[in-house]
């Protein structure tokens, strides 16, 4: 079985400007591409798992998100030779979405659905994998999926509540040195 780095996107890989949905609004956090390169070199599959309720709220479309994902994948390949194994997203919200997107689902973090799907699709051993997130919902999803190591990003002085088995780091760039 393989192992993976499950990564939230906004606030972990890129600056969270709020509902980032286009290449023009996307800005890598310092050291994030290089850290992804180090994780890949250490054998981790790179899997991005991101709540994207902006789709359900009507702020942007899944087509917009797919274009942004391609942009991110292309940038990472060009910058540091990283191949993103998969992008997973949840477009739903339980109270603030429209139409079919308005629902309680199993994919929206803190539910582990996106991670469990990645585990199935890529034959991943969760116990040998890591999760990096900036919110409690990320950590809870990783824990529920049985991910072996959980990292909470504080983003330079932000408040990070660490629970049992959670390692706090200033940014994604610090994770490879913890492994």
Model feature map: region roles:
Residues 1-47:
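Active-site neighborhood of HAD-like aspartate-dependent phosphohydrolases
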Residues 3, 63, 67-86, 95-131, ...:
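Asp-based, Mg2+/Mn2+-dependent phosphohydrolase catalytic module
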Residues 7-9, 50, 132-134:
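Active-site flanking residues adjacent to catalytic metal/cofactor-binding acidic residues
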Residues 10, 52, 111:
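Anionic group-transfer/hydrolysis microenvironments
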Residues 10-11, 89-91, 114:
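Short, flexible segments with low predicted structural confidence
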Residues 13-30, 55-64, 79-83, 98-106:
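Metal-dependent phosphoesterase signature
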Residues 32, 36-69, 83-93, 142:
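Substrate-recognition element of Asp-dependent hydrolases with the DxDx(T/V) motif
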């Amino acid at each position: 079985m393989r192992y993976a780095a499950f990564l939230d996107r906004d606030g972990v890989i890129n600056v969270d400007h709020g509902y980032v949905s286009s290449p023009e609004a996307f800005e890598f956090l310092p050291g994030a591409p290089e850290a992804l390169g180090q994780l890949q070199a250490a054998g981790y599959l790179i899997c991005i798992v991101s709540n994207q309720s902006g789709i359900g709220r009507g702020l942007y479309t899944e087509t917009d998100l797919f274009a942004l994902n391609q942009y991110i994948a292309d940038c990472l390949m060009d910058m540091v030779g990283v191949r993103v194994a998969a992008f997973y997203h949840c477009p739903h919200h339980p109270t603030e979405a429209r139409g079919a997107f308005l629902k309680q689902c199993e994919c929206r973090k803190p539910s582990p659905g996106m991670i469990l799907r990645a585990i199935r699709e890529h034959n991943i051993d969760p116990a040998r994998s890591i999760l990096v997130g900036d919110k409690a919902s990320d950590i809870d999803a990783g824990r529920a999926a049985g991910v072996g190591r959980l990292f909470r990003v504080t983003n330079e002085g932000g408040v990070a509540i660490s629970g049992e088995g959670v390692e706090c780091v200033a940014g994604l760039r610090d994770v490879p040195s913890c492994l």
